[in-house]
Amino acid sequence: MKTSVLLAITAMCSDDWLLVRMKIRPFDKNTDIRIGDIHLRDNCPVTRLLSFNYAFSYPVTSCGIKKIMFQTNDDAILSEISYKPRLHTTYEFPVVCFVKRLKFPSVMHFGMSGFDAHTLKEIPQKTKGQESPTPTQSKTWTLNFNSVNKEQLSKKSLYQ
């Protein structure tokens, strides 16, 4: 397999989608690949024709695309482009893309990430059979909507 062909293929991916682009002329400036001669993995056709590229855009759950999840927060998305000229053998070009999985913090009772939603102070972790602590506010503010000019704007004048 020619190195130039591998450089003619680019892949971008997310946790759910794979986007692959292949140059229309991957071998040299005189040889075009016809749109009907290439497919992604399980005979999935080109989804978009660009000026200089063919594009394949598919969810990772289709077209025989493989998703390998590692114990870290990394995934590998694997596929291949099949190129079959009319009367010749089939050529397979590997497609590999890596993506970091998003790691969302666990949502806690009445707050997120261990902070109370109202006071932004840490909530102690509760153990089994223990009640959740009731959030408390240390100070109450009321808004004063009297007219003020720009120079008077301060925390004291707005919140009394």
From Swiss-Prot:
It comes from the Eukaryota. Residues 1-13 form the signal peptide. Belongs to the PLAC1 family. This is Oocyte-secreted protein 4B. It is found in: Secreted. The keyword Signal applies. The keyword Signal applies. Keywords: Secreted, Signal. One of its GO terms (cellular component) is extracellular region.
